[in-house]
Amino acid sequence: MASRARKKRPSGRPKERALTEERIVAAALQLIDSSELASFSLRDVARSLHVYPTAIYWYVKSRDELLGKVVAYATRDVIPPSSNTDWKVWLRDMCHRYRRAVQKHPNIAPLIGSQMRSNAGIRADFIDGVLTALAAAGFPDERIVDAYNVIIGALVGFICQELAALPAENQAKWAEAHRKRVSMLDVIQHQALARHLPRMANKAFIVRWSNGTEVPLDTSFDLFIDVIILGLEQSLKARR
């Protein structure tokens, strides 16, 4: 009896066990969490998943595309669960959710804050949520884009500055050197600085030697949201 001929494996998408886009993106995010963004590569992702690099390209076409998907994945839970609420409550909740998402993965902060490639992970639901909140606030169509840019620019700017990366090498040495620089600032000629520097040291932008992963700026972020919301309200009142 003739032996059965082996079936040829069909061409097309690779059959690696349970390989999906979500697994690839999650693995990429895990690698970015544990190393520097600059050294991240698709080969590293393939190695961590025990597949050939060519298998990755069935799901993402390039490193840039994958990085965009990583941002979308890391920020997937930033939209508040209910849209049927006051726009100020929604906006405040969204800002806190966005910050917590980036705090969990601080190595994506420079990707979000300074690289256009992060836009490849565009989330229509996130943009729609912000626009819906602004429309509920009363912003007319001709001003809603400016208000949207204020929110996104300010939010991303604060978070990425708060979580700014320390020097890649000799972090402890750099931190000690900057602490000394701060302590040696000329407070004699700058009275406001002399008064507030003890409170600001390592707790305020420019005069800190730890970033937000070690010394989070919680109360400053709360005030930041208050200012943004009040500013939006005042902007509406001024045009009426």
Predicted segments, located by residue:
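N-terminal intrinsically disordered/low-complexity leader segments
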Residues: 1-18, 194-208, 240
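Short hydrophobic clusters on alpha-helical segments that form packing/core surfaces
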Residues: 24-32, 70, 74, 98, ...
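Hydrophobic alpha-helical connector segments
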Residues: 79-125, 141-144, 148-151
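A hydrophobic membrane-anchoring alpha-helix module
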Residues: 213-240
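Hydrophobic alpha-helical bundle segments that form small-molecule/ligand-binding pockets
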Residues: 126-182, 232-240
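Core domains of carbohydrate- and sulfate-ester-processing enzymes
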Residues: 179-196
